[in-house]
Amino acid sequence: LMPGEFLSIVGPSGCGKSTLLNLIAGLLTPEHGSITLGGRPVSSGSAAVGYMLQKDHLLEWRSIYKNILLGLEIRKELTPEKLAHAEALLQTYGLDRFRDARPSQLSGGMRQRAALIRTLVLEPELLLLDEPFSALDYQTRLNVSDDIGKILKSSGKPAILVTHDISEAISMADRV
């Protein structure tokens, strides 16, 4: 993938789309061959790969802001620069007014946007999206996928989306 390129992988349920992302993320080890990113082999917990799942996995007992900082806390990277970056992402993507809200107070689309910011704040080299809109109703899915597509394009990061929805893939990706 080139910088800023968006690739979609389309297929029916059970065909191995999520398994492929798990291999790319280093969560699974290939039986043969290897997977590299920037010439380096990927491994579990690699900071180079950001992974956005089907469910947002926001923790209800934490505010949106604290949820966004979770990965930085785990990595022990809560630097002033990273906190400023988190604040900028909240503002840029319209969640600054909801920084103190709990996840249950947000719509499904806003929750997905918070999950994406949580991924972007870690500044990965590659973004993986595993059917991140599948839990949303049709109209919300259209709006959120358009918003998130714009966010990803503006980030300049390459991204891989897996989906079973061909129209979603075509509307978001540079290549399918």
How would you label these PLM feature ranges?
Residues 10-12:
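The feature captures the beta-strand-to-loop junction immediately N-terminal to the Walker
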Residues 25:
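Helix-to-loop junction immediately C-terminal to a conserved catalytic motif
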Residues 33-45:
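Conserved ABC transporter NBD signature motif
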Residues 62-69:
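Short coil-to-helix segment of the ABC ATPase nucleotide-binding domain corresponding to the Q-loop/switch region
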Residues 69, 80-98, 149-150:
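Conserved ABC ATPase "signature" region
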Residues 101-104, 118, 122:
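Conserved signature/switch motifs of ABC ATPase nucleotide-binding domains
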Residues 127-130:
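Catalytic Walker B motif of ABC-type/P-loop ATPase nucleotide-binding domains
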Residues 156-162:
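Conserved H-loop
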